[in-house]
């Protein structure tokens, strides 16, 4: 871009010429290479393996807490897809299906009834 006649370059011409070179120097993987090998890590590896082995032994003891299965919790047969007659089951346990509904009604306090009593005073 230099003018051969005067030997003067146009302003910005040098920047344009260097832009191609600069863009090639930028980007992924273009940084200075770094030494990824750390000698301190090699010395610490021996200590870490001893600590890891101690942790593994402690974890094995904790995981081994298997309790015996209570046989009363195990159902004797499959229950999936089984038709259940709740009235029959209640009769076997000497329960009435309607007993629960009657008990609930006795404990109920109607808030509207209390408001009426306050209005009377």
From Swiss-Prot:
Domain of life from the UniProt record: Eukaryota
Main localization of the protein described in the UniProt heading: nucleus
Cell compartment(s), UniProt: Nucleus
Record keywords: Chaperone, Nucleus
Disulfide bond residue pairs: none
Stretches the record annotates as Disordered: 1-121
GO cellular component: nucleus
Chain intervals with Acidic residues compositional bias: 40-70, 97-121
Keyword Flavoprotein tagged: no
Family: Belongs to the CHZ1 family.
Subunit structure: Forms a heterotrimer with H2A.Z-H2B, stabilizing the association of the histone dimer. Also, with a lower affinity, forms a heterotrimer with H2A-H2B.
Record's function text: Forms a chaperone-bound H2A.Z-H2B complex that acts as a source for SWR1 complex-dependent H2A to H2A.Z histone replacement in chromatin.
Protein name, as recorded: Histone H2A.Z-specific chaperone CHZ1
Source organism: Pyricularia oryzae (strain 70-15 / ATCC MYA-4617 / FGSC 8958)
Gene coding for it: CHZ1
């Amino acid at each position: 871009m230099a003018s051969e006649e005067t030997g003067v370059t146009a302003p910005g011409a040098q920047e344009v010429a260097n832009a191609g070179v600069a863009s090639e120097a930028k980007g992924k993987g273009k940084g200075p290479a770094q030494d990824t090998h750390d000698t301190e890590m090699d010395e610490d590896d021996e200590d870490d393996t001893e600590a890891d082995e101690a942790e593994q032994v402690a974890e094995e003891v904790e995981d081994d807490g298997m309790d015996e299965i209570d046989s009363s919790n195990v159902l004797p047969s499959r229950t999936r897809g089984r038709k259940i007659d709740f009235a029959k089951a209640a009769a076997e346990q000497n329960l009435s299906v309607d007993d629960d509904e009657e008990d609930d009604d006795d404990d109920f306090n109607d808030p509207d009834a209390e408001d009426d009593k306050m209005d009377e005073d």
